[in-house]
């Protein structure tokens, strides 16, 4: 069995490719069932975010497993395999484990050290458990990854002032506003007329960072006003006006800055919608949705400046050097957690031999116990029989304790295999 990961991210694919592979939560069960339906895939889990899609699997054969996952991605996205392959990466065994640890720690994120990815890894594990696509191996791996993410954020400086896609989006707005005034620094958003489209987790973070950056008020548009009102109630110090999404055109006409973060499958804003508005002032659109909420042609409309998640690189580059130094603190911790999982994984190789050894000893114990009890005659009480049986079990457990502990102990694969072969020969066990 082999652990593998196949995926793509902001490092390997542009947003127009990533959005076609995005897997929303409502189709996660079907996707996991499709993967598990392949005979090569024993366990599966999917991580789908705005910046990455990664499929972790336990497979019989790594090459055939990668092929199975690639075929699934091609079918899901409608992209030919040849068109998709240049954007995919794959890692196996130790490399796959190391990669997941880095992802959970935020070291592979667009915004280095961002905190939201850990919640997304937790969600990946929860959905895998709910839809019964996880087995003991991936469940243990994901648990270890969550532990890693928590330790990095609590034990290193990378967790200090951690940022997110939403905070980077707000910072991008500040940067672009400053550049429009001939300034090379971030400016306050106090005078901007701001709208946020969507009322999910990303929008919650947007409101949080807009408030911190001086926004004087925000219009929150959502399909259901009730959900927007529930969200706005968590920000009593930020004036939030909740409106239905049907009012979108009105605010496209009047606001100066709009953020979009909805779960829509198709763009909700495009050139055809913007062109008739005849705006006289600049409209800045910042889209952090994947799939994109704003079509690429929106930027072709006069007076409209449009940005998507790939444009956040400009903001990230401004503080990446400092966060890289913090990331180096986390590397040793990551290696510890990865090694701990790999030692557990390698120890599983000994389980069949240990089970055979226990079974063999139990057969001998039972056989010899029956011989002894038959010699005791009818005067041997039931209580005395139980004492003798417990004694025989205790002796076997004491004898097996040290060899079983040694077989499970951390060691090189070569040393473990040599020890297993010796035990199998000494006790006439079948080779595992």
Curated annotation (Swiss-Prot):
Pathway in which this enzyme or protein is active: Porphyrin-containing compound metabolism; protoporphyrin-IX biosynthesis; 5-aminolevulinate from L-glutamyl-tRNA(Glu): step 1/2; Porphyrin-containing compound metabolism; chlorophyll biosynthesis
Keyword presence, Oxidoreductase: yes
Entry EC number(s): 1.2.1.70
The UniProt record lists the keyword Cell membrane: no
Stored InterPro entries: 4pyrrol_synth_GluRdtase, 4pyrrol_synth_GluRdtase_dimer, 4pyrrol_synth_GluRdtase_N, GluRdtase_CS, GluRdtase_dimer_dom_sf, GluRdtase_N_sf, NAD(P)-bd_dom_sf, Shikm_DH/Glu-tRNA_Rdtase
Binding site for NADP(+): 198-203
Enzyme class, spelled out: oxidoreductase
Site (Important for activity): 99
Binding site for substrate: 49-52, 109, 114-116, 120
One matching Pfam family: Shikimate_DH
Active site: 50 (nucleophile)
Superkingdom of the source species: Bacteria
Domains (record comment): Possesses an unusual extended V-shaped dimeric structure with each monomer consisting of three distinct domains arranged along a curved 'spinal' alpha-helix. The N-terminal catalytic domain specifically recognizes the glutamate moiety of the substrate. The second domain is the NADPH-binding domain, and the third C-terminal domain is responsible for dimerization.
Annotated function: Catalyzes the NADPH-dependent reduction of glutamyl-tRNA(Glu) to glutamate 1-semialdehyde (GSA).
More details: During catalysis, the active site Cys acts as a nucleophile attacking the alpha-carbonyl group of tRNA-bound glutamate with the formation of a thioester intermediate between enzyme and glutamate, and the concomitant release of tRNA(Glu). The thioester intermediate is finally reduced by direct hydride transfer from NADPH, to form the product GSA.
Family to which the UniProt record says this protein belongs: Belongs to the glutamyl-tRNA reductase family.
NCBIfam families: hemA (TIGR01035), PRK00045.1-3 (NF000744)
Protein name, as recorded: Glutamyl-tRNA reductase
Protein source organism: Synechococcus sp. (strain CC9605)
């Amino acid at each position: 069995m082999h652990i593998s990961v196949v995926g793509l991210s902001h490092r390997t694919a542009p947003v127009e490719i990533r959005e076609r592979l995005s897997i929303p939560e409502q189709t996660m069960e079907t996707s996991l069932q499709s993967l598990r339906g392949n005979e090569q895939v024993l366990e599966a889990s999917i991580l789908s975010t705005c910046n990455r899609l990664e499929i972790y699997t336990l497979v019989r054969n790594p090459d055939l497993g990668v092929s199975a996952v690639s075929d699934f991605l091609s079918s899901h996205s409608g992209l030919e395999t040849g068109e998709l392959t240049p954007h995919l990466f794959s890692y196996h065994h130790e490399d796959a484990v190391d990669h997941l640890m880095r992802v959970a720690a935020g070291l592979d994120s667009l915004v280095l050290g961002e905190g939201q990815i850990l919640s997304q890894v937790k969600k990946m594990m929860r959905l895998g458990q709910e839809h019964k696509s996880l087995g003991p191996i991936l469940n243990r791996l994901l648990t270890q990854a969550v532990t890693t993410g928590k330790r990095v954020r609590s034990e290193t400086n990378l967790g200090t002032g951690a940022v997110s896609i939403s905070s980077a989006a707000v910072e991008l707005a500040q940067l672009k506003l400053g550049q429009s005034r001939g300034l090379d620094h971030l400016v306050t958003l106090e005078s901007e007329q701001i709208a946020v489209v969507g009322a999910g987790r990303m929008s919650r973070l947007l409101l949080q960072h807009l408030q911190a950056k001086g926004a004087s008020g925000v219009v929150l548009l959502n399909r259901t006003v009730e959900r927007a009102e529930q969200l706005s109630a968590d920000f009593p110090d930020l004036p939030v006006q909740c409106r239905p999404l049907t009012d979108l055109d009105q605010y496209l006409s009047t606001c100066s800055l709009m953020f979009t973060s909805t779960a829509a499958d198709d763009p909700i804003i495009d050139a055809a919608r913007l062109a008739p508005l005849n705006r006289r002032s600049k409209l800045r659109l910042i889209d952090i949705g994947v799939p994109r909420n704003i079509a690429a042609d929106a930027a072709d409309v006069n007076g409209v400046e449009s940005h998507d998640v790939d444009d956040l690189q400009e903001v990230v580059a401004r503080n990446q050097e400092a966060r890289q130094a913090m990331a180096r603190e986390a590397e040793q911790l990551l290696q510890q957690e990865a090694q701990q999982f790999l030692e557990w994984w390698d120890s599983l190789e000994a389980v069949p031999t240990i089970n055979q050894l226990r079974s063999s000893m139990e057969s001998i114990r039972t056989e010899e116990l029956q011989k002894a009890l038959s010699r005791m005659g009818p005067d041997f009480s039931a209580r005395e029989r139980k004492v003798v049986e417990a004694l025989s079990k205790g002796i076997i457990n004491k004898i097996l304790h040290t060899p079983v502990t040694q077989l499970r102990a951390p060691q090189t694969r070569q040393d473990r295999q040599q020890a297993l072969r010796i035990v199998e020969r000494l006790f006439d066990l079948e080779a595992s």
